[in-house]
């Protein structure tokens, strides 16, 4: 039977998530053992750099990137840039190793105590699977949660002995919609008010930069159609206008 690790990596392949940035330790060794050649693992010297690299990479690729840090200490080091990724609405899947399940009761060295509390409130969802068999499903939910608007980081705490456990089933991939749109009636009212304005001003936010390749061009065309000045929203996390 396949292992939890094999099922998880197969799932990640189907989701198109093959980029990982990390600064691992002993609690991540089982995840890294026999690492598949079709995945890219970028190692950085400190966890703040790890999250910063992953944030930029995810924005550039326009898809989630996995972050791999070392139990509670590594996650603590990552918190500053995790806050930034949250404000950037970047879909990162943050993973941290955890002590073996059979030892967690005694809280030995390297145990991440209250693991799901540490990254809050700067993640959309935090979870430690109840069983080894739940690890692939946890990744699927993490993916879905991270990419749905407003996008943002999520966190998984993963006991180090889970990866080599056997699984009797594959985790099916489900489709996840990220589309969002305004209410048609509200949009009509908004358009009428804009058309009636004598000196309109547009304030663009980071959603334009996240919306895809045509969003900038559409933003420019909209401003030109109205002959309107354009301003960035205060403390905008991404550049919305060229």
Predicted regions located by residue number:
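N-terminal alpha/beta PP-like core and its mobile active-site loop of ThDP/TPP-dependent enzymes
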Residues: 1-242
């Amino acid at each position: 039977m396949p292992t939890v690790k094999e099922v998880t990596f197969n799932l990640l392949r189907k989701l198109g998530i093959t980029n990982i940035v990390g600064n691992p330790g002993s609690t991540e060794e089982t995840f890294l053992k026999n690492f598949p050649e079709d995945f890219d693992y970028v190692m950085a010297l400190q966890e703040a750099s790890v999250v910063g690299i992953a944030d930029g990479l995810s924005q550039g690729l326009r898809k989630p990137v996995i972050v791999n840090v070392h139990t509670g200490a590594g996650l603590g080091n990552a918190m500053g840039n995790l806050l930034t990724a949250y404000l950037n609405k970047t879909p990162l899947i943050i993973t941290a190793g955890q002590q073996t399940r059979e030892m967690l009761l005694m809280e030995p060295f390297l145990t991440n105590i209250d693991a799901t509390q540490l990254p809050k409130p700067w993640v959309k969802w935090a979870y430690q699977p109840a069983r080894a068999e739940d690890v692939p499903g946890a990744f699927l939910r993490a993916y879905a949660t991270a990419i749905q608007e407003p996008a943002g980081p999520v966190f998984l705490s993963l006991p180090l002995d889970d990866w080599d456990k056997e699984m009797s089933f594959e985790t099916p991939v489900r489709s996840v919609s990220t589309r969002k749109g305004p209410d048609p009636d509200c949009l009509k009212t908004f358009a009428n008010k804009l058309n009636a304005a004598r000196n309109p001003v547009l304030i663009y936010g980071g959603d334009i930069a996240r919306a895809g390749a045509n969003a900038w061009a559409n933003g420019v065309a909209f401003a030109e159609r109205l002959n309107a000045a354009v301003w960035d929203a205060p403390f905008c996390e991404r550049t919305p206008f060229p």
